[in-house]
From Swiss-Prot:
Changing residue 215 to A: Abolishes activity. The gene is TRM11. SUPFAM superfamilies: S-adenosyl-L-methionine-dependent methyltransferases. The lineage of its organism: Eukaryota, Fungi, Dikarya, Ascomycota, Saccharomycotina. GO terms for molecular function: methyltransferase activity; tRNA (guanine(10)-N2)-methyltransferase activity; tRNA binding. This is tRNA (guanine(10)-N(2))-methyltransferase. GO terms for cellular component: cytoplasm; cytosol; tRNA (m2G10) methyltransferase complex. GO terms for biological process: tRNA methylation; tRNA modification. It comes from Saccharomyces cerevisiae (strain ATCC 204508 / S288c) (Baker's yeast). Pfam families: UPF0020.
Amino acid sequence: MKKYLLYMVQVHLNFRRAELESLADLYNLSIDFSQYDANSPFFIVELENDQQAKDWIKRSILTRGIYEYWGQGTTLDELHKDIQRQSNFEQDLQLKFKHSTFKFEFECYKGNSKAKRVEQIETFRYLGFEGKIDMKHPQEVFTVIEEYTPISENVGGKTPTRIYFGRQVQMSNRSAMEKYDLKKRPYKGTTSFEAELSLVSANIAQVKPGTIMYDPFAGTGSFLVAGGHFGSLVIGSDIDGRMIRGKGAQVNISANFKKYGESSQFLDVLTMDFTNNALRNNLVIDTILCDPPYGIRESIKVLGAKDPERFLGKEDMEIDGEKAYLRRDYIPTKKPYALDSLLDDLLQYSSERLPIGGRLAFWMPTANDANIETIVPMHENLELKYNCVQEFNKWSRRLLVYINRGSTFNGSSNHGIKRSKDNFRERYFNNFN
């Protein structure tokens, strides 16, 4: 086993470990998280080889990169001594890369030193590298990572408190955030999900090539785009046909996939009420990833009559001799629906359609009431794997991730029980008072 240094970002800390664990599980890697510290951007792990490190981190969003660990110290002198104390120093560290082209890089966390970098690099002369320096396309990149204690919240430190050194093995997929930035997307809306957490959600849901991912509340397709990025074939539906159709041939969900060169990953989107799902029963859905409507922009609705008695008989109405509901311009009636009921339907559908081990991941809003317990929906055949919270001012949204364990699992269930305190939409507009 070899030691590797993982360098992570200090954002969305509630999601970071879930992403790392999910990616490790996706590639069948055994990672010891006993030394993981959510408050630190550094995590030293043991892996069998570089390939395992590459597999683990190549699609991660909440890390920066992973490095073959060579040593650490509170000062540069301590670092050099620690490197030379490594049991594999001569055989694996010095000789293996003796003739490789290389370059040095510096990374700084919460500060920056005014030290002369060239002089610092010269202190590593004992490594005995004889290969040429190549700043553009080196075979190896050796990285000095300096950790600082900031002077204040807005002022970084000047002297590093800890220095790490390692060989770059794999940089993360964090650059995908720039590619999928909403500002550059042809088709987006007020409810479009941000690129970073869309991609993180897809990682935790274990969206992968050779599978089908379904978003039953697709909207403008943010999660479909994230699923396509990770190689899944994606299909979506939404009760609002306007969202599905977009604003023309050049401004719709399909146009987004065309812009990213991923049209081959896009199966289709359908105007459909999820609670009256029309997808055939034998369609294999490997992953369900979605952001159900909270009822903030508008109330949650499904197909049906708000007042069934008043609607009675109108279902057979004809226009020009044709059943009204068969016409292309037909707009079906809709009725209000509770968020709790919608989530119950989502869990039940997932238990029926996902394969054993398949994941359901969705976002759920909650109010930040200190004296009220948040009750998440549960299903007897689904294991709640992660409950990741993103907090705002007076409310939060949670990424809930479930694994389908099948009919023999017999977990807890709260189907049909009112879990939400009052109506989330009403409370939102009343400032949660």
